[in-house]
A protein has these predicted regions:
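Terminal or standalone catalytic/regulatory effector modules within metabolic enzymes
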Residues: 1-204
Length: 204
């Protein structure tokens, strides 16, 4: 494989260059740069992959710099996967229904949505909840998602799942990543990064 992990490239210099391409200058802060690099390495060891997840990497860097202010906060979510055709509870293409409870500022919103697979259902429910308050979300479209089971052999239901989401707006597209033993949680984490980064792009 010619593709290398971000952490295996030229270390700090590579990460600083990547951050610069995302509009973030890390050149004058060696300590923070090292902390971010260590975080990336740790996450990659747990299954994260940032080569096609610029959105998640940008959010991660902003967290370290104290520049990340979430636009919404999750209270809880619930996803029901239609298993009538014996597709398996983790089937990414099974008809699904999601309900989310979200806080935007001091508002609490409960919304439901339907979609193909847990990602589609969560995306529909989240948009239903927040678009009225964050209208830029209407310009974003979930264009692709990939689910990969990591360490599959012998892991059974505890196998780690990586979800990569591609989202687009009028100016381009970006990828985000979520990793968890629970496909729903991995999907949610990737989805939140995708919306948050899209809002950061819209504001920038």
């Amino acid at each position: 494989a010619t593709r290398m992990l971000v952490s295996e490239l030229a270390g700090k210099a590579s990460l600083a260059a990547k951050a610069k391409s995302l509009g973030i200058d890390l050149s004058g802060d060696a300590r923070t740069l090292q902390a971010i690099l260590d975080d990336v390495k740790t996450r990659e060891a747990h299954g994260y992959s940032y080569e096609v997840a610029d959105g998640s990497l940008a959010v991660l860097i902003r967290r370290h710099l104290g520049l990340y202010e979430p636009h919404f906060r999750l209270e809880s979510f619930r996803v029901i996967v239609d298993d009538r055709e014996d597709t398996g509870a983790l089937a990414k293409d099974a008809a699904s229904e999601a309900t989310v409870k979200i806080h935007v500022g001091d508002r609490r919103i409960v919304a439901a949505g339907e979609g193909t697979g847990p990602v589609g259902a969560l995306d529909a429910a989240l948009r239903m909840a927040i678009t009225e308050y964050l209208p830029q979300v209407a310009n974003m479209e979930l264009t692709d998602y990939k689910v990969r089971i990591l360490d599959e052999e012998g892991a059974g239901t505890s196998a780690t799942t990586r979800v990569i989401i591609t989202t687009s707006d009028k100016r381009g597209s970006w990828g985000t990543v979520g990793v968890s033993e629970n496909i729903i949680e991995a999907s949610w984490n990737a989805l939140v990064d995708s919306i948050e980064y899209g809002l950061i792009r819209a504001e920038g």
